[in-house]
Amino acid sequence: MAPHQKSRINRINSTRSVPLRLATGGVLATLLIGGVTAAATKKDIIVDVNGEQMSLVTMSGTVEGVLAQAGVELGDQDIVSPSLDSSISDEDTVTVRTAKQVALVVEGQIQNVTTTAVSVEDLLQEVGGITGADAVDADLSETIPESGLKVSVTKPKIISINDGGKVTYVSLAAQNVQEALELRDIELGAQDRINVPLDQQLKNNAAIQIDRVDNTEITETVSFDAEPTYVDDPEAPAGDETVVEEGAPGTKEVTRTVTTVNGQEESSTVINEVEITAAKPATISRGTKTVAANSVWDQLAQCESGGNWAINTGNGFSGGLQFHPQTWLAYGGGAFSGDASGASREQQISIAEKVQAAQGWGAWPACTASLGIR
């Protein structure tokens, strides 16, 4: 149906008169009576088309005649009140509601609706199932144009948002994750992380997790040690190390980037170092003396531990020569390791030589007897 421009309304004009020569008084009487009749049938009518009103003066006696005079053309699905064949009276209102095509999208599902509703609000009431908690992308008072309209409706969903470790459960009428964050006034920083794409469609019971990431540059002065200088000592057992000259730490300015996630440090990366004072390396004497294979000590270790120099069975003795912890530490083994199992073959033999010198072969009574060493 297409409303047209209001037709020109002819009105009785009393400002100008046309002199008539009347032959008889009977003719004059007839004209007078006709004029009174015309005035009596003139009606002031309001035509309301989709909320837009026009006033006109008509001589028509029916609604159909009034609409024809107003230039209103009706479509098959348009609604007229009163009906077209209804008689019309002075100061009546004729209401026309034209049929429009509306694409109604509810949660992504499209419905093509033919409606005579004037506004979006009227449409939603007509369709039903839409509540005040739903989000509508159009102004409820917006007039639906003749060309039609697309209206999207989003239902609320209960979701959880974990923002930097703080969890909130909310009901939001949002189409996607981005809209949900906007409704909660949540902004993401350039480094922040989120577990779902922002354009992902929001569903009931969705769980959104946001990790707040902060990168901070920290500069501090720290001490450092230089790599030691080693000097071989052929008289000391292999693996034996003795500090000949102490070193001294240096200092340097270190700049690093510290990344925190939800307030907890995740990583620290050095990006620059500037040496302030040089470090002095320590001088360490390192023994190179080895004990020949198949020595008496190897035979004794074979008897005591099956030749396993790293054994520690938890029975109170350890190492290839089965040192008791007190004996090991008393004769200097702590310089190599907390127990004999952590020391090398040569280091264990060097301690064993000290024990043998102090206690004799009786420190290993059973095995030295079976080997015929004593």
Swiss-Prot record:
Disruption of the gene: reported phenotype: Not essential; a double rpf1-rpf2 disruption mutant is also viable. The double mutant displays a prolonged lag phase and slower growth after transfer of long-stored cells into fresh medium.
GO CC, any one term: cell surface
EC number: 3.-.-.-
Phosphoprotein among keywords: no
GO molecular function: hydrolase activity
Signal peptide: 1-40
Locations listed in the record: Secreted; Cell surface
Protein's job: Factor that stimulates resuscitation of dormant cells. Has peptidoglycan (PG) hydrolytic activity. Active in the pM concentration range. Has little to no effect on actively-growing cells. PG fragments could either directly activate the resuscitation pathway of dormant bacteria or serve as a substrate for endogenous Rpf, resulting in low molecular weight products with resuscitation activity.
Listed name of the protein: Resuscitation-promoting factor Rpf2
